[in-house]
């Protein structure tokens, strides 16, 4: 009985399932043959085929294909085609125009090239067209017939020609127009005013000229207008008041001039007004200064003037105020604290005077405050008032309070202060005790003042302090031993408050860098700067415990005793300057273990003995050791004549160099013979062989010396003959004023040759041995390494103690300069320019890896080794320092080089440099381009000091979009930026085998 019932149930359920299956199959839409044919032709032009697409001639069920939606009335017409972010490459087919029932066409975030087929602009039912973030080019046709269109997004492509404002003639229902990040040029034409329903108009980062057309001001529903980074000019029209729904107005980085119109009381919903870097004059309009809706006001870098008057009682929503670099004068507005939500204030570089108002005691919301270069007075009053700002974390007061006394008032207390900069004020007094109560202090800069007395021991009690600059004062006594115990420099537990990303943070320039090329800004590396004081006593052995310290500068003091060998424990150290002291003994050999040390000086001390020759010491110039009793192989030979070979200059002068002359005498035969061989090879390559030199491969020292005094070997046949004297004249005898940076193994000078050409001359340090072999490697290899994305070696010269390399001059300096040092650099580097820089540099690297014979490993890929010409084309520099490889080798086992933050993890495990190591370093550069952040930067929140770790963390939290530089990131170009981020992360794989080849890297970047 039970079996019978079970069978009946099974039969019933089977019949029921068959019924539903039959019913469903009868109602399922099958793709209309007309649309099927169009889709097959469309996909035939693209690769790879999307998942689930069936490219078989027998299949007719395209309504089930990925990204396809058909209507529900059994006609099988395609109404949605959505294949965004599918890595599709190829071109679009005219057959798309046959999908005459389509409502949504979304092919964004792919790699589609060429122009848009004309047929697409005649789809009468199309409501959404999104082709953003592709590689599409050409102009937009004058005839557009899209009457149902509501959203039109062609941003982040390569479209050119006139702005397609005529789209509104037949598309009156359109609500969103996004054309940003393209190459549209010419006058900002009228036409958009016919789109009466328009809400978003994004035209930023093109090349538009003229002014905002009048018909645009008829758009009552417009809430976002982005026209930033064009070349628009003239005054901002008063008719902007008609845009009553406006929420965000961005006119920054244009050429607007005149006064800002006083019409903001008619823009009741405006939250964000960005007008920085224009030519606005006058004051803040009264209506803008009374806006209750405004959240952010950025008018930095204009010519605004007069008294600053804001009605903060009315500005109840204001959060960020940036009016830096203008001409405001008078006193600081007393009512700023009435802006109850105002957190970030930048008023630096104006002409304010007087004192910080007493009312600032009530500025409870204030977090970031910069008043640098504002001619303020009464620092005692200012600090006494600002201490009441309970949320204040960053205070920058540089270039104020000239000659006043730094108060030592025990009642002062800054509870949450993390960054304090009161530099270059010529303050008198001593280190105030009240600073010790700021327990969260992380960065303290009191440099370039006139402070005296001892540096107190409590300075080492700060748990988070990682940057201390007390240089250029008059401190006396010993260095407090407590500094050797700074917790932030012995552990990774560091957290720094990061200012608002739209605000310029205080930056300390590298004063030794005098021009664009190779310039670097020290982005707050962990630092102890105590130079140019009157400190005495020893350098404590315990300083070796500061494993996280990057810069240790004690120059120009009266320190005595020996250099502790324990300093080798400062394993992150990049710069060590102990020059101009009274140190004795020898240079510890253990310092050779400092792998990242790139700047070192012990000049003008009383040191003796042998200069270490291993590690980074082979790269330091003789000037690092001068005015001591030191000797060393390849420098000042240690021999029977050691006494005469020592440098015996007066402590503070640089007279004749007897030891150098003897050293040159011992090495001249080798140097001049090497010169003859290199000259002979170079002339043979150029087809200009001197018969006398060819006959005699050995010349006496006098003859070669005479040739060397005149000869500059040039590799370009059209270059005019040069002599060493010409190079001296072109650099004013290598005057420091012509230094444009420090490249590999020496200084780089800007030179203008007799024919008017600009070049960069690298003057190599060192005399022979390893240094000469590196020089010969550069000369022999770079003369054959010719590629548009490499810095061209134009020639070289041997003369006496000088070895000179002559390079092409790069007008725009280094990528590092534009990203990290020049204040407006990141904003001027648009995304398309950054992408082109990455693509070019990758091509240069591919040539080094595969195009050269022998192949070359760069081994020091970084943003400061990517130079930019006048058109911002990228050129790899300093690759001559790489070890050479035969075409059949896959790695070299030599002493490793590199720069902290760019070095692959595997380099710490074995002395093996590989192509994949260069790819890793290139991935770090890609992150710099995307984020505008340094690889290692202490001024980041906890866990964000290391750029790679921070990016990985943000990706895992699905917050990848937050890593992008806000100056270039927008929905218009996010597809390209996400793709480059993906490429960067692949380059940064911990397993070298999982990283792309250089060829793949180039191909992927070209397809972005």
Swiss-Prot record:
Concerning PROSITE patterns, the annotation shows: LRR (PS51450), PROTEIN_KINASE_ATP (PS00107), PROTEIN_KINASE_DOM (PS50011), PROTEIN_KINASE_ST (PS00108)
Q: Where in this protein does the record say Phosphotyrosine is found?
A: 807, 847, 902
Reported induction:
Up-regulated by fungal infection and wounding.
rRNA processing recorded as keyword: no
Q: What happens when the gene is disrupted?
A: Gradual loss of individual cells potential to form callus as the tissues mature. Premature senescence of the leaves. Limited root growth. Enhanced resistance to bacterial biotrophic pathogens, but increased susceptibility to necrotrophic fungal infection.
Impact of changing residue 598 to Y on the protein? Answer: Decreased responsiveness to PSK for interaction with BAK1 and decreased root length
So what does mutating residue 623 to Y actually do?
Answer: No effect on responsiveness to PSK for interaction with BAK1 and no effect on root length
Q: Which gene encodes it?
A: PSKR1
Question: Native species of this protein?
Answer: Arabidopsis thaliana (Mouse-ear cress)
Sites carrying sugar chains: 55, 64, 73, 106, 160, 170, 187, 242, 301, 311, 373, 378, 391, 472, 493, 510, 534, 606, 622
Task: List the membrane topology term(s).
Answer: Single-pass type I membrane protein
> Which regions are annotated as LRR repeats?
75-98, 99-123, 124-148, 150-170, 172-194, 195-219, 221-243, 244-266, 291-315, 316-339, 341-362, 363-387, 392-414, 415-438, 439-464, 466-486, 521-545, 546-570, 571-594, 596-619
Protein name per Swiss-Prot or TrEMBL: Phytosulfokine receptor 1
Enumerate the PANTHER family for this protein. LEUCINE-RICH REPEAT-CONTAINING PROTEIN DDB_G0281931-RELATED (PTHR48006), OS08G0276400 PROTEIN (PTHR48006:SF20)
Residue span of the signal peptide, if any?
1-25
| Assembly and binders | Homo- and heterodimers with PSY1R. Heterodimers with the somatic embryogenesis receptor-like kinases (SERKs). PSK is not directly involved in PSKR-SERK interaction but stabilizes PSKR island domain for recruitment of a SERK. Part of a functional complex containing PSKR1, BAK1, CNGC17, and AHA. Interacts with AHA1, AHA2, and BAK1, but not with CNGC17 or BRI1.
């Amino acid at each position: 009985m039970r079996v019978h019932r079970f069978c009946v149930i099974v039969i019933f359920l089977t019949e029921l399932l068959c019924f539903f299956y039959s019913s469903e199959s009868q109602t399922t839409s099958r793709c209309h043959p007309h649309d099927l044919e169009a889709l097959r032709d469309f996909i035939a032009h693209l690769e790879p085929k999307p998942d689930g697409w069936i490219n078989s001639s027998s299949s007719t069920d395209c309504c089930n294909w990925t990204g396809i939606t058909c209507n529900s009335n059994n006609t099988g017409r395609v109404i949605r085609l959505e294949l965004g972010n599918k890595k599709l490459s190829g071109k679009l087919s005219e057959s798309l125009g046959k999908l005459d029932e389509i409502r949504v066409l979304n092919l964004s975030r792919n790699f589609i090239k060429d122009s848009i087929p004309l047929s697409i602009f005649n789809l009468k039912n199309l409501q959404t067209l999104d082709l953003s973030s592709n590689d599409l080019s050409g102009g937009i046709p004058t005839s557009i017939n899209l009457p149902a269109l509501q959203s039109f997004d062609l941003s982040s492509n390569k479209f050119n020609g006139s702005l397609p404002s005529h789209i509104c003639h037949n598309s009156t229902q359109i609500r969103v127009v996004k054309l940003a990040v393209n190459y549209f040029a010419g006058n900002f034409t009228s036409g958009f005013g016919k789109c009466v329903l328009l809400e978003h108009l994004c035209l930023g980062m093109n090349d538009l000229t003229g002014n905002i057309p009048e018909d645009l001001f008829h758009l009552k529903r417009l809430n976002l207008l982005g026209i930033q980074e064009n070349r628009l000019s003239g005054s901002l029209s008063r008719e902007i008041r008609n845009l009553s729904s406006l929420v965000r107005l961005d006119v920054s980085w244009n050429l607007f001039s005149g006064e800002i119109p006083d019409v903001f009381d008619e823009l009741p919903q405006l939250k964000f007004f960005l007008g920085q870097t224009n030519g606005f004059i006058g004051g803040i309009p009264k209506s803008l200064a009374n806006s209750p809706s405004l959240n952010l006001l950025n008018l930095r870098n204009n010519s605004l003037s007069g008294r600053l008057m804001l009605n903060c009682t009315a500005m109840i929503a204001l959060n960020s105020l940036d009016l830096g670099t203008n001409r405001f004068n008078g006193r600081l507005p007393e009512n700023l604290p009435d802006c109850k939500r105002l957190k970030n204030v930048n008023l630096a570089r104006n002409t304010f005077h007087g004192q910080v108002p007493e009312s600032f005691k009530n500025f409870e919301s204030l977090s970031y405050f910069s008043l640098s270069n504002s001619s303020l007075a009464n620092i005692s009053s200012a600090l006494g008032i600002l201490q009441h700002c309970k949320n204040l974390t960053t205070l920058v007061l540089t270039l104020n309070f000239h000659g006043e006394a730094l108060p030592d008032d025990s009642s002062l207390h800054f509870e949450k202060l993390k960054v304090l900069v009161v530099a270059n004020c010529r303050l008198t007094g001593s280190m105030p005790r009240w600073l010790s109560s700021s327990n969260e202090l992380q960065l303290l800069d009191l440099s370039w003042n006139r402070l005296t007395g001892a540096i107190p021991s409590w300075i080492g009690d700060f748990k988070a302090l990682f940057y201390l600059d007390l240089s250029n004062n008059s401190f006396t006594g010993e260095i407090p031993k407590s500094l050797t115990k700074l917790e932030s420099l012995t552990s990774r537990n560091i957290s720094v408050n990061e200012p608002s990303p739209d605000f310029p943070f205080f930056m300390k320039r590298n004063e030794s860098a005098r021009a664009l090329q190779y310039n670097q800004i020290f982005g707050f590396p962990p630092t102890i700067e105590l130079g140019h004081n009157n400190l005495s006593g020893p350098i404590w052995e315990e300083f070796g415990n500061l494993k996280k310290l990057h810069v240790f500068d004690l120059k120009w003091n009266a320190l005595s005793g020996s250099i502790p060998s324990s300093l080798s424990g400062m394993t992150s150290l990049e710069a060590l300057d102990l020059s101009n002291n009274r140190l004795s003994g020898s240079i510890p050999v253990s310092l050779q273990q400092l792998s990242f040390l790139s700047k070192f000086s012990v000049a003008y001390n009383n040191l003796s003995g042998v200069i270490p020759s291993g590690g980074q010491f082979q790269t330091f110039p003789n000037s690092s050791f001068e005015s001591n009793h030191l000797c060393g192989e390849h420098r000042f030979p240690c021999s029977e004549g050691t006494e005469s070979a020592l440098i015996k200059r007066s402590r503070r002068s640089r007279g004749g160099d007897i030891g150098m002359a003897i050293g040159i005498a011992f090495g001249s035969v080798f140097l001049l013979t090497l010169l003859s061989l290199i000259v002979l090879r170079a002339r043979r390559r150029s087809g200009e062989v001197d018969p006398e030199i060819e006959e005699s491969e050995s010349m006496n020292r006098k003859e070669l010396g005479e040739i060397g005094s005149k000869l500059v070997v040039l590799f370009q046949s059209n270059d005019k003959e040069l002599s060493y004297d010409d190079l001296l004249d072109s650099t004013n005898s290598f005057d420091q004023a012509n230094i444009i940076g420090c490249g590999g193994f020496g200084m780089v000078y800007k030179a203008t040759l007799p024919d008017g050409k600009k070049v960069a001359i690298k003057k190599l340090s060192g005399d022979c041995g390893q240094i000469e072999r590196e020089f010969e490697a550069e000369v022999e290899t770079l003369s054959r390494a010719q590629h548009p994305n490499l810095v061209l070696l134009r020639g070289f010269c041997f003369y006496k103690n000088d070895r000179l390399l002559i390079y092409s001059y790069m007008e725009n300096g280094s990528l590092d300069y534009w990203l990290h040092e020049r204040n407006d650099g990141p904003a001027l580097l648009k995304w398309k320019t950054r992408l082109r820089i990455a693509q070019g540099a990758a091509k240069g690297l591919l040539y080094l890896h595969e195009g050269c014979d022998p192949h070359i490993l760069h081994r020091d890929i970084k943003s400061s080794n990517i130079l930019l010409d006048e058109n911002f084309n990228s050129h790899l520099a300093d690759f001559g320092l790489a070890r050479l490889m035969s075409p059949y080798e896959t790695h070299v086992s030599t002493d490793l080089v590199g720069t902290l933050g760019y070095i692959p993890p595997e380099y710490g495990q074995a002395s093996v440099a590989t192509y994949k190591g260069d790819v890793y370093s290139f991935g770090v550069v890609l992150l710099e381009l995307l984020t505008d952040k340094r690889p290692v930067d202490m001024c980041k929140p906890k866990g964000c000091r290391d750029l790679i770790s921070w990016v990985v963390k943000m990706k895992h939290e699905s917050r990848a979009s937050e890593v992008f530089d806000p100056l270039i990131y927008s929905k218009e170009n996010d597809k390209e930026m996400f793709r480059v981020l993906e490429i960067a992360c692949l380059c940064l794989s911990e397993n070298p085998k999982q990283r792309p080849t250089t060829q793949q890297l180039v191909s992927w970047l070209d397809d972005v």
